[in-house]
């Protein structure tokens, strides 16, 4: 039972991380109209 919980937590972490990375990449490419929280945290200048 403990192993299943660990696998589920790992999957959730991967999904969350990949979602954050997708937002970060979109910010770098200037895909957003307004700077998102990730751009503000990393200090990226949005055009």
UniProtKB/Swiss-Prot annotation:
The keyword Membrane applies. One of its GO terms (cellular component) is cell outer membrane. The keyword Membrane applies. InterPro entries: Lysis_col (IPR003059). Residues 1-19 form the signal peptide. Keywords: Cell outer membrane, Lipoprotein, Membrane, Palmitate, Plasmid, Signal. It is a lipid-anchor. One of its GO terms (biological process) is cytolysis. It is found in: Cell outer membrane. Coiled coil: none annotated. A lipid is attached at residue 20 (S-diacylglycerol cysteine). It holds the Pfam family Lysis_col. A lipid is attached at residue 20 (N-palmitoyl cysteine). It comes from the Bacteria. Its main location: membrane. Lysis proteins are required for both colicin release and partial cell lysis. This is Lysis protein for colicins E2 and E3. It comes from Escherichia coli. The lineage of its organism: Bacteria, Pseudomonadati, Pseudomonadota, Gammaproteobacteria, Enterobacterales.
């Amino acid at each position: 039972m403990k192993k299943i919980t660990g696998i589920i937590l790992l999957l959730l972490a991967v999904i969350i991380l990949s979602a954050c990375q997708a937002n970060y990449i979109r910010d770098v490419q200037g895909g957003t109209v307004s700077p998102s929280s990730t751009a503000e945290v990393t200090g990226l200048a949005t055009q």
